[in-house]
Amino acid sequence: RRENNFWEQLVYNTPLKKGLISSRLRLEHRFQEKLPLQANLSLRKFTFSSRIRYRFTYQYLLTQSDVKVPINLVIFDEVFIFLNPNGTPYGFNQNWTFLGFKIQFNKKLVLSAGYQKITFKRSDNDYFKNRLWTNTLVYKL
């Protein structure tokens, strides 16, 4: 189903001698298409919901700081919490954990790759767990 999101976020970075600690707080707003899906665009309806996401990231520089292509070990954990319509947190949605590497080829091109585990709450006491290898290639214009 179709989903459109927009968000606001705050990021706070703490540089370390051979690494970085980063905290990100994101307020996410979601417009999700209601089921059943409609072929006729004029009949489509969307629901609105919000959630808070908090990510804590630790990066450790594995190479010398002056190398042309630095490689970092990256560990993060991100928790997703649903908000009710008046903005009060009310329930766990999902959790992402990641262990991998970040390779900075130059100022514009970065590759992150590693193991990610996603825990998603389906209903009370029913959690779906997905384990996967994730590759993310970012090119800044």
Predicted features by range, described:
Residues T14-L16, L27-E33, D77-L83, K117-K121, ...:
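Transmembrane beta-strands of outer-membrane beta-barrel pores
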Residues E8-T14, L25-L27, I52-L62, L99-I103, ...:
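Residues on the lipid-exposed face of transmembrane beta-strands in outer-membrane beta-barrel proteins
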